[in-house]
Amino acid sequence: MTEYLSVSTLTKYLKAKFDRDRYLERVYLTGEISNFRRRPNHQYFALKDEGAVIQATMWAGQFRKLDFELEEGMKVLAVGRISIYPPSGSYSINIESLVPDGVGALAVKFEQLKKKLTAEGLFEQRWKQTLPQFSKKIAVVTSPSGAVIRDIITTVQRRFPMSQIVLYPTKVQGQGSAEEIAGNIRRANQRGDFDVMIIGRGGGSIEDLWGFNEEIVVRAIFESRIPIISSVGHETDVTLADFVADSRAATPTAAAELATPNTKVDLINWANEQEKRLFNRLTHVIKIRRERVDKLSQSVVFRQPERLYDGHLQKLDRLCERLSVLTENKVANMKHRYELSAGKLIPTYGKIVEAKKNKTEQLYQSLLLLDISKIKARGFSLVTDEKGKIIKSVSDVKKGQTLDVELTDGKVIVEVK
């Protein structure tokens, strides 16, 4: 008897087959991006070729690892796992990694980064620095063993041997080269005494030159305070470093020529130019000064010199008058203050003097009362022993002792009995 399967049963059976198939666990596909519309997190699109289409899913974590922008119609190489989605019965690829297809992958990265940096304005002419005419010190960022540095040294020594070359040995190809190039550009800027910088390498494939297309290198060149000459690859090779550099040279020799003057010709031209500029400047200054003298000579002051002092004399008179008024006012004010103070001080001083006079009289009368002659006149006497000691009490004397008695009109000697 024939057994009919439900759609769900068949779909589950096929899903189990897909899940157990080791070949479908990791599939390598090539195709074009179709129906792509960027979403905030996970990405859903399709891969197609001339004969078929397969739905594709890429989770946010994997999508963030891409170093290029997905675009509609882009040919890519995808690696992922095939699975069936039961509710719709459709199969799809869950993409784990994705890169542009073939040599075009780097070309895509190049164009996308160029577009991004152009939008930011990094390649605009207004940012370009002028190369110095006479470079005393030149920084060179390149490989120490290539023909580039030899060509630069030879050219500089031939054209302008006074220039000093400082080499920053740099890896210019392969993994880590971009970091070294950018790092040495920044180190040269930190040193701060270079007039110009040459960066470059010899020719090669797009992969060989790719270090000079990395964003880290482009931004280091843009941020450089030292004018930079780019000399990367052959004349037909173009890198993003060429776009952002202040000048581009087709060869290392051409770069060295841009960095140095042609000693005889350029020095003569420079001297002639400086002479011409100096002459024009002096002529201009003399003209300005002559016009100023002519203008001054026509002024009223030069025609009537005495008028030069009119204003100052008037100002001096006004100041003298003002000083006189201020002095009179000051004296009057001080006199008034003196009179006010004197009016208050004299009555007070009189009272103080009278009080002191009365006090003095009282003290004088008190002293008169204490005068010994006055005391004697009132009938008192001063008794002393033979040693001059004043006798104050009967107990101070003894029988037979001789005493001196001072009276008002003289002294008598008595004996105690």
UniProtKB/Swiss-Prot annotation:
It comes from Lactococcus lactis subsp. lactis (strain IL1403). CDD domains: ExoVII_LU_OBF (cd04489). GO terms for cellular component: cytoplasm; exodeoxyribonuclease VII complex. It catalyses: Exonucleolytic cleavage in either 5'- to 3'- or 3'- to 5'-direction to yield nucleoside 5'-phosphates. NCBIfam families: xseA. GO terms for biological process: DNA catabolic process. This is Exodeoxyribonuclease 7 large subunit. Its EC number is 3.1.11.6. It is an enzyme of class 3 (hydrolase). GO terms for molecular function: exodeoxyribonuclease VII activity; nucleic acid binding. Belongs to the XseA family. Coiled coil: none annotated. It is found in: Cytoplasm. It holds the Pfam family Exonuc_VII_L. The keyword Zinc does not apply. Keywords: Cytoplasm, Exonuclease, Hydrolase, Nuclease. Heterooligomer composed of large and small subunits. PANTHER family: EXODEOXYRIBONUCLEASE 7 LARGE SUBUNIT. Bidirectionally degrades single-stranded DNA into large acid-insoluble oligonucleotides, which are then degraded further into small acid-soluble oligonucleotides.
